[in-house]
Amino acid sequence: MLLSKYFLPVLKEEPSEAQVTSHKLMLRSGMIRQQAAGIYTWLPLGLKVLKNIENIVRLNMNKAGALEVLMPCIQPAHLWMESGRFDNYGKEMLKFQDRHDNTLLFGPTNEDMITDIFRHNIKSYKDLPKNLYHIQWKFRDEIRPRFGVMRGREFLMKDAYSFDINEENAVKTYNQMYKAYINAFRDLGVFVIPVIADNGPIGGNLSHEFHIIAETGESTIYYDKKFKTLKDNPDIDVEEIKSWYAAAEEKYEVNKLPISEQEITSSKGIEVGHIFYIGSKYSVNMNALINDEYGKLTPIEMSSYGIGISRLVAAIIEANCDEKGIIWPSSVAPFKVSLINLNIHDSKCVELAEMAYKELSDKNIEVLYDDTEARPGSKFATHDLIGSPHQIIIGPKKAANNIVELKDRKSGVIEDIEVGSLMSVL
C-alpha cells in the first residue's frame, strides 16, 4: 500500500479527551474516530488490526471444533423474558419498539437466542455435542463509557456456546475451549493469565477470566510463576494449568495460598476473555430438552465462551507500546513492514524502494510504502507511531551503495543490509 494513497489521519498532539495510553495512540495513529460517547468508526488502519485479531480467533475456534454462525444484533425481547433475564441488565440493555409494537433489544449477549435456536433444531443426544460461535457487534449502554474501545458502548465480541448431554461431557468441552483460548492468545502474541471467576448474571458455577498482562491494567493478578512457561509451550495439559494458582486482587489471601508465597508473582492485567460452564439454567427456563439414550427428556448442559475482539485491540496496545507509539506483535500488525523512502526525488532511493516494495508485495508481506513528501523526522515519527514490526529505511547516502537500513521496532536495533539480501533477512 502506498502511503500517498492511504487514509491515515495521524495526530501530532495527544487528544485531550483520551485518558489511557491505548485510546491516545489509537486516535493519534488514525485507527479510530469517535462518533458519540463510547461509539467509534474504525478507520482503515484500525480495521486491519481488528480483522487480523478476528481471523486468529476464528482459526482457533475452528480448530477446537466450533462451527461459525451469525446471529442478528437485534433480538426479540420475549426470548429474554422467557429466560428470566430481561430485567437483569437494567438500563444497560437498549430496548425499543418496532412499528408493530413488538419489543426488541440490541443484544448485549446471545445465550437466550442460541438456546432458542438449539431447542427448535436439536432433539436427540445423538446430535451432540455441538459448539456454535459467532463474531458480532454488541451494545451495552454504559453510564460512563471510557478508555476508548476498552470500555465502549458498542463492541465486537466472539461468543461461543456449547451443548452437551451431561455435566461430564460439558466439562470436557469446557476444557477444550480453555485450551483453545490459551492457544488463541499465544497466536495473538500476548501473555494471558486464566483466573477463576464468578459467573455473574450469565449463570452457572464454573468460570475463568483471561487477563492480558499489561502495566496499565485495571486489575492486579496474583499467579504461580509456572504460568510464564505458557508463552512458548504449545503442548498444554489443561488439568495441570487449571491446578496452578491464580487470583484477582479481591480474592487473594496470603494466609490461604496453596503454594508458598515465594512461588507467586503479581502483575497488572486487562480482562479480554471469559468462559462459563452454565449448566441447565437456560435449558430449564426455556424448555430446551432432548431425548437421552433412554428416551427420557433431559435439559441440555450449556457453556458460554466470550472474547472481546475490539477490546483486545486496545489491550494489545497497552501491553505493547513505548513513548514513541505502538509496537505491534507481528501476528496482528496492520502492516508487517514500513518502507520509508527518505528522499522521493532521489532516483536511486526510488529504485531501491520500488524494488523492495515489489519483492515484499510478491511475497504477500503487508507493506506500507511511504512515498510522501514529508520530512525524514516526520516520517520516522509516523511509522514509530503506527508500530509496524519492521522498518526498511532508504536514504541517498547508503542507497548509492545498494544498502538499506532494517530497523526492528521493538528493540530499536538498526542494521545495514545489502538490498539483494533483504528478503532472506526478513
Swiss-Prot record:
The keyword Lipoprotein does not apply. It catalyses: tRNA(Pro) + L-proline + ATP = L-prolyl-tRNA(Pro) + AMP + diphosphate. It is found in: Cytoplasm. Coiled coil: none annotated. Its EC number is 6.1.1.15. GO terms for cellular component: cytosol. GO terms for biological process: prolyl-tRNA aminoacylation. Gene3D superfamilies: Anticodon-binding domain, Bira Bifunctional Protein, Domain 2. It comes from the Bacteria. GO terms for molecular function: ATP binding; proline-tRNA ligase activity. Keywords: Aminoacyl-tRNA synthetase, ATP-binding, Cytoplasm, Ligase, Nucleotide-binding, Protein biosynthesis. Its main location: cytoplasm. PROSITE patterns: AA_TRNA_LIGASE_II. Homodimer. Catalyzes the attachment of proline to tRNA(Pro) in a two-step reaction: proline is first activated by ATP to form Pro-AMP and then transferred to the acceptor end of tRNA(Pro). Belongs to the class-II aminoacyl-tRNA synthetase family. ProS type 2 subfamily. This is Proline--tRNA ligase. The lineage of its organism: Bacteria, Pseudomonadati, Pseudomonadota, Alphaproteobacteria, Rickettsiales.
